[in-house]
Amino acid sequence: GWGAAHILSKQGLGGKIPLSRLLADAIHYAEAGVPVTYSQSSLTAKKREELSPIPGFAKTFLVNGKAPTVGSIFKQERLAKTLRQIAEKGTNDYYRGDLAQLLAKELTDIGSPLRLDDLRRHRAKLIDPLELKHRLGKVYNMIPPTQGVVSLMIIGILDQLNLKRFKVDSAE
């Protein structure tokens, strides 16, 4: 879908930023790493036993078999390599190129029913998003099967409540 969005941006909206630039920050942070947050550390520790049998989980998310510590640097070199290849070869490589072949092989190796042909048949669809008219402007979100409807309902309800009349941290 991101490839179709990038093309739409360039052709229909006058977008000028190349894919390589759009992915540059993600590549940087995947390579250089980001500080591990409390929630990442605690949830990884909590779910470690359940998730460890999943192929690739321990190698990607654990440090010496344990959850990473808060403040340590979490790097994702394989993600950086994948994003760099997408930046160089285009998003189509993920579904129909070298990345697709690698992904299909790894999926087969772990017993997934997805095959290379499934990836090759994938096509993004352009759809009209959900829209909510808000007093501050329009808010957009995705159609089901996402939580888009619920999030727009919450925003709409909050818009009607006039929250400015409440004090911060009040019981109301």
Where are these regions (language model features)?
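Feature marks proteins synthesized as precursors that undergo proteolytic processing into two chains
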Residues: 1-172
